[in-house]
């Protein structure tokens, strides 16, 4: 079984890939199941009702307004795709929640507002204190130790206080935006172990994000060392996702990454249904 559990579409501000086109291409590529995981990052992007009331509230990125998922269109569109491609492709409904400790309440409200719609959610830390990693705002004025530890400290806070998530997304994402060079996993081993123990205790998991290859990273995301730590702590829930935003990303490198997971000692991966993990042999 081939599944891609980190897929963006036209409903993410950084993708223009139509839902039906994603599904059609997945079938061509021999993918059995996908889960749409479009972006929501409260206080970074406005919701569509906020944007319609005041277009100036949306930041402009690469010439386009940056807005959260259009919820009222998102869920019906995915449901229609699920019916349209039934028998050829299993289509699941998810989102990638870019949570910060001070926005947990808004994500609780969003999840409860659409109760019954969710198969899967990714908990990602994309910002701390509304400061972004991708543009270096969070790193500015901090030492390499400070911004790396600050990232993991925020992840721990959120993982402890927020419950509506399935897996931790790209666990060591901060590496992608670290211009100071390699920072040893050993420096964060204790706090990452605490994060992973919290996930395991809550019945949550982590993802292997295959975008490490297209970003030119020298290791997996999360790293081989952190994946081994998760395994050694007893972690079993593990999804694999391409973090696709464009056609060329969809399903990329997943078969190879499954072999890497076997080498590390994993024997299973997960898909999700109604927020519950389903285990499959690697």
Give residue ranges: language-model regions.
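Charged catalytic cores and adjacent phosphate/nucleic-acid-binding surfaces used
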Residues: 1-9, 19-24, 129, 159-160, ...
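Residues that line or immediately flank small-molecule/substrate-binding pockets and catalytic motifs
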Residues: 38-39, 125, 172, 273
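Hydrophobic/aromatic residues located in beta-strands of well-ordered beta-sheets
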Residues: 34, 91-93, 121, 206, ...
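An N-terminally biased module of ancient metal coordination in phosphate/nucleic-acid-related enzymes
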Residues: 1-101, 177, 182-186, 210, ...
